[in-house]
């Protein structure tokens, strides 16, 4: 089920092949895009990439957790977390690819 991990270099290479920019320009473009996304998220903005996903920062309140070894209650401090919500388009593509692979493996 697992596959290759796609890196920044892989994205830059794909831009190089598909867009025709130089490798240096492609890598710089990927970095600029990722920097913009990161800056927006850090500033608490929601980043919505249609047909892909939404990245959002949420505040979580303090709550009581439990140490699994001792059972002792431990306070979990309030914090900010980033959430990733895949779009319905992406979810559908994932499902279709899974179904194709399942069909091939049954033959």
Swiss-Prot record:
Keyword Nucleotide-binding part of the UniProt annotation: no
Matching InterPro entries: Hist_DNA-bd (IPR000119), Histone-like_DNA-bd_CS (IPR020816), IHF-like_DNA-bd_dom_sf (IPR010992), IHF_alpha (IPR005684)
Keyword Metal-binding tagged: no
Gene Ontology annotations of biological process type: DNA recombination; positive regulation of metabolic process; regulation of DNA-templated transcription; regulation of translation
Alphabetical list of SUPFAM superfamilies matching this protein: IHF-like DNA-binding proteins
Keywords: DNA recombination, DNA-binding, Transcription, Transcription regulation, Translation regulation
GO molecular-function terms, A-Z: DNA binding; structural constituent of chromatin
Domain of life where this protein originates: Bacteria
GO cellular component: cytosol
Protein family according to the UniProt entry: Belongs to the bacterial histone-like protein family.
Annotated HAMAP family: IHF_alpha (MF_00380)
Assembly with partners or alone: Heterodimer of an alpha and a beta chain.
NCBIfam families per record: himA, PRK00285.1
Role of this protein: This protein is one of the two subunits of integration host factor, a specific DNA-binding protein that functions in genetic recombination as well as in transcriptional and translational control.
Protein name per the record: Integration host factor subunit alpha
Gene name for this UniProt entry: ihfA
């Amino acid at each position: 089920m697992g596959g290759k991990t796609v890196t920044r270099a892989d994205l830059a290479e794909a831009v190089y092949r598909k867009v025709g920019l130089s490798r240096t320009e492609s890598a710089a473009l990927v970095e600029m895009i990722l920097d913009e996304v990161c800056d927006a998220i850090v500033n608490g903005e929601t980043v919505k990439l249609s047909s892909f996903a939404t990245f959002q920062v949420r505040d979580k309140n303090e709550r009581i957790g439990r140490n699994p070894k001792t059972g002792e209650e431990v306070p979990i401090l309030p914090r900010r977390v980033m959430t990733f919500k895949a779009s319905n388009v992406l979810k559908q593509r994932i499902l279709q690819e899974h179904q194709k692979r399942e069909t091939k493996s049954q033959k």
